[in-house]
Amino acid sequence: VELLQNVFGKHGRDIWKKAQGIDHSPVIPYQERKSISTERTFEKDTTDHVKLKSILTAMAENLAYQLRRGNKLTACVTVKIRYSDFQTYTQQRQIPYSAMDHNLIPIVMDLYKNLYQRRLLVRLVGIRFSNLVEGGQQMHLFENDEKIANLSIAMDKMRQRYGDRAVLRAVGMDAKTIGRWNPFTGE
């Protein structure tokens, strides 16, 4: 300690403490989320496409809402299917950054359509949004996104004021048990 203090002055003691692993500053864990996801395992395996699409729509809508609440955008959508024989298949697609339902739900449905090929009972479905970045939604210059964005903003405000299930797409209303909390803030 004395040698370090002679060489480095008042910082010598700090260097010695750090070399000994002595540090009384608080540990502040922080890790940026890399993805958000949700899955649903069915009580009874099913081949009911209406039910599966309803649940996937509700999941995508919920995750997109979580992205917007956390001021995040996703660039990768993954859909997962596990069949009754426990074979699990996933498919993903890279997309332009988005957090808007009208962009994400059709991609989820397309991936589901590509994945559901085996004609077996489905045990589990899931969705993951990854490659997350901070940011708001980018509007396209020549598309009519403004009305849709305003609709999403209004729906989000209603959800924040009256609860997450205050406004739902009709197709997703059967998915009554989709959890709706914000993984970015823990709310």
Where are these regions (language model features)?
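Acidic, metal-coordinating catalytic segment for phosphate/diphosphate chemistry
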Residues: 95-187
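DNA-contacting surface of Y-family translesion DNA polymerases
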Residues: 1-121
